[in-house]
A protein has these predicted regions:
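Gly/Thr-rich phosphate-binding beta-strand-loop-beta motif of the actin/hexokinase/Hsp70
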Residues: 5-28, 109
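Short alpha-helix plus adjacent loop in nuclease-associated cores
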Residues: 84-122, 129-133, 176, 277-286
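Glycine-rich, often acidic, oxyanion-interacting loops/wings at catalytic, nucleic-acid
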Residues: 136-230
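Low-complexity, acidic/Ser/Thr- and charged residue-rich accessory regions of DNA metabolism proteins
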Residues: 276, 313-429
């Protein structure tokens, strides 16, 4: 269902608790409860019942997102019935409720729909659903491939057999696998290793077939092909990340503003503010974890290609303690990259560098994970750049294992600053 749901425009509100074989249905109207019943998990019996008992009345439906997918939604939408699919985490729950049944769940959905307390998730079109199936299959196969490689290495380690030496990036080349098949092993170990190698080669073929199918599918669809070109014009975005983004975002026309995608990916900070006091914490981590991980991986590539993003990365690093600086900064870059993704999709044009920013290449120290301050630095109270804290911020105690002994608020009072050392805004009420 597109647009906002307005309860006063409908007469009957139908809550559906959908399971594998049946549907628990509850009907309510503006006056209250009407009836509850069970029926088979098909759209036809539900439609026949509605036409028979509620003729000439405007009816709305809602059910929870889950493993049953969009089949019921498609059946209702085909007959022009509005249907919402609500995210389970966004459905109001009574804190004192101790009884849960299908009938009570469908009744709660119906009442919440009547009260206008539910919002539908984004429902992708058939094209984007097919692309999502392909990208999910690739993720599963790649995960299985990594597990198979780990099982082979674990077997060799357990048996005290050295893995054949190979250059970085070529550990699983044809030559290495050929050496593994020729290793001197006992009978059962040899059999197990051969079976694992056969499974490894089969998984590799499955991954290649899936990748080929994703490329073919995107190439044959004009809209997907165009959007892929726009996304791949961004630094740090390759065809794998681009296809994953399109599969999860769906129709780009549903994007309302350039910040919505960052919220969808869980790259915006949590916030607990009251009055004039603003307190922001870590990112929300909502949405697809795999897609967020891919975007962060792409951000590492982006800061090597784009001078503006590289300088932004460095500026964020300077605001945070040494042991977390690079991790916090790369997440900030990923959020900035998500805004660029939204822009190229909403404006349907490739990314163009506004002004080339001259920036020194990244060093190994900047990109590698930073360890905690050692004991000597803790005693001396050194900052990430090596200077002492007492000379820069009056009244500040020394660091102890990366944590300040005095509160951030006290530091801000001492320096009359509106920002803490962690880059968060702190305002006193």
């Amino acid at each position: 269902m597109r647009g906002n749901f307005i309860p006063r425009e409908y007469d009957i509100f139908t809550g559906l608790d959908v399971s594998k074989k049946s549907i628990s249905v509850t009907f309510t109207n503006h006056q209250g409860f009407i009836r509850s019943l069970n029926m088979p998990h098909k759209a036809e019996p539900l439609l026949n019942y509605v036409r028979k008992h509620f003729p000439d009345q405007k009816i709305a439906f809602v059910y929870e997102a889950g493993p049953t997918g969009y089949g019921l939604y498609d059946g209702l939408a085909a007959q022009a019935y509005p249907c919402l699919i609500a995210a389970p985490s966004m459905i109001p729950r009574a804190p004192g409720q101790r009884v849960k049944t299908n009938r009570l769940d469908s009744k709660a959905l119906s009442e919440n729909l009547r009260g206008g307390q539910l919002k539908s998730i984004h429902i992708p079109s058939a094209t984007y659903r097919q692309l999502r199936h392909l990208t999910q299959l690739r993720d599963v196969l790649v995960s299985e491939l990594a597990g198979m490689k780990q099982r082979i290495k674990s077997l060799l380690l357990f048996e005290g057999i050295e893995f054949p030496p190979a250059p970085a990036g070529s550990q699983w080349s044809f030559l290495v696998k050929d050496k593994l098949r020729k290793l001197a092993c006992s009978g059962t170990v040899r059999f197990k290793l051969d079976q694992l190698l056969d499974s490894l080669e089969f998984n590799e073929k499955q991954v290649l077939k899936t990748i080929t199918e994703i490329r073919r599918f995107c190439r044959n669809d004009p809209e997907l092909s165009q959007c892929m070109k726009y996304l791949m014009s961004l630094p740090g975005i390759g065809w794998i990340t681009a296809s994953q983004l399109l599969a999860r975002i769906g129709d780009w026309r549903e994007l309302k503003n350039i910040r919505q995608l960052a919220g969808f990916l869980g790259l915006v900070p949590t916030e607990h503010s009251t009055g004039e006091r603003v307190d922001r914490g870590s990112i929300t981590r909502t949405g697809d974890e795999r897609l967020r991980s891919k975007l962060i991986q792409g951000s590492w590539s982006a800061i090597r290609q784009d001078g503006e993003l590289r300088e932004f990365f460095r500026s964020v690093c300077r605001k945070h303690p040494r042991e977390v600086a690079s991790r916090v900064a790369i997440v900030a870059v990923a959020r900035k990259l998500s805004v660029r993704i939204s822009v190229v999709l909403m404006k349907q044009r490739p990314y163009e560098v506004r002004e080339k920013v001259h920036s020194a290449p990244l060093t190994q120290e900047e990109t590698s994970p930073r360890e905690r301050l050692d004991d000597e630095q803790n005693r001396e109270g050194k900052t990430p750049d090596g200077s002492t804290l007492e000379t820069e911020i009056p009244g500040l105690c020394a660091l102890k294992r990366g944590a300040f002994r005095v509160s951030v608020t006290a530091v801000c009072r001492a320096t009359n600053s509106s920002k803490s050392l962690f880059g968060r805004e702190v305002k006193e009420s």
